[in-house]
UniProtKB/Swiss-Prot annotation:
One of its GO terms (molecular function) is serine-type endopeptidase inhibitor activity. Keywords: Disulfide bond, Glycoprotein, Protease inhibitor, Repeat, Secreted, Serine protease inhibitor. This is Ovomucoid. Avian ovomucoid consists of three homologous, tandem Kazal family inhibitory domains. Signal peptide: none annotated. The lineage of its organism: Eukaryota, Metazoa, Chordata, Craniata, Vertebrata. InterPro entries: Bifunctional_prot_inhibitor, Kazal_dom, Kazal_dom_sf, Prot_inh_Kazal-m. The record marks M18, E19 as: Reactive bond 3. PROSITE patterns: KAZAL_1 (PS00282), KAZAL_2 (PS51465). CDD domains: KAZAL_FS (cd00104). Disulfide bonds join C8-C38, C16-C35, C24-C56. Glycans are attached at N45.
């Protein structure tokens, strides 16, 4: 099973769009889009990872 990943190298960003493309984090929390998820990844110092695309 290939690991799913998201490139968060351009983050954090000060503001995210309201675009809804959900991702499920390793914390079992649904993030509304890549920007929200990547900001959380940066805040977690890389401990948060992508579980899968779509809602948890």
């Amino acid at each position: 099973l290939a690991a799913v990943s998201v490139d968060c190298s351009e983050y954090p960003k000060p503001a995210c769009t309201m675009e809804y493309r959900p991702l499920c984090g390793s914390d079992n929390k649904t993030y509304g889009n890549k920007c929200n998820f990547c900001n959380a990844v940066v805040e977690s110092n890389g401990t948060l990872t992508l579980s899968h695309f779509g809602k948890c």
